[in-house]
Amino acid sequence: MRGLSASSVVAPWRERWINWRNRLVADPRFQRAAAASPLTRFVARRRARALFDLCAGFVYTQILLACVRLRLFEALASGPAQPSQLAARLDLTPEATHRLLRAAASLNLLRALPDDRYALDDLGASVLANPSVAAFVEHHALLYDDLRDPVALLRGETRTRLSQFWPYAEGRADDPEACAAYSDLMARSQQLIAEDVLDAYPFGEHQSLLDIGGGEGAFVAAVAMRHPELRLQLLDLPPVAQRARDRLATQGLARVDVRAGSFLDPQPAASADLVTLIRVLHDHDDAMARAALRAAHEALTPGGVLLVAEPMADTPGAEAIGEAYFGFYLLAMGSGRARRRAELTLLLQEAGFAGVRHLPSLRPMFASVLIGRRV
């Protein structure tokens, strides 16, 4: 054993243990014994349920889609109802209504009451409270089509619908019609995380904010409500910038300086002491992400702060969101990837930011927050 590091000794042992365990778990006799034993029955059933949920996940999402499209949650917003009352409103037969209600209740979207009425349960109420969730449920119809043949997607053999939906993934960033749909979707989803980001960092310590890739202005509008003293700027592509001007004007926020352009263009030097990139970097491959960070560095005053908020691949307890969901969503989109915190930290450091650190946020599965200072 002389000359071997501790890690080189541990690794083979760990691999032998994993191989032995996998052979055991894959043995049908062990599976039956584990399911029958009072000592292991709970674990065996839980894992069997987890495996079945993986197989049935598409069915569950389609049940949610049916609830959204039929506006079932809105129908129950004022209180519980009988299936017979709902059938006419949903334009379904009584049998189909019962089937949907029971299915939704099994997924904790609805709650079945003892008198055969149904009410919203926690998940259904959450969808109702966050219109952006329903918008994404509808939007996922594109993703499901792209995932019809996941092997072809992995091999790059298909032209995906998502890449057509996101115009900058196909080089159509100046097409106003193409930008309209995705800009509206992003504006809705920004509302879900804006308050979390504002709670995570003291924006009031700054004089001027530039939101790069700010879309239609949902985030800067939330900042304006919380910090009316901040001078606000937004940068996005020309068709999106015009939509931002119109949207912000209707909210009484014409004071926001909306700039039409790209982060690939030279930025006005020292134009803000706080720059934000809210769910921007993960949409782009490394070369474009570095360009966005260079633009942020150019725009910041010396010592100014860059704030990055986006889903990260290694968020504790939400690994499947970063690695599985965003991993395949961005593959279908044709651009970007969810990065681990260490990867983003390195990108920020390479772009000239020091003291990069993570800030706690309420729902890090949707947006984890990193900050760094320009040096």
Regions flagged by a language model, labelled:
Residues 2-28:
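Eukaryotic partner-binding/assembly regions in large regulatory complexes
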Residues 30-207:
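Conserved Class I S-adenosyl-L-methionine-dependent methyltransferase catalytic core
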Residues 110, 118, 232, 256-258, ...:
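Generic structural signal for residues in well-ordered beta-strands
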Residues 117-119, 313-314, 362-363:
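Conserved beta-strand edge residues that scaffold enzyme active sites
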Residues 130-317, 365-368:
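Conserved adenosyl
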Residues 307-351, 356-358:
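C-terminal alpha-helical "lid/dimerization" subdomain adjacent to the S-adenosyl-L-methionine
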Residues 352-375:
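Core SAM-dependent methyltransferase catalytic element
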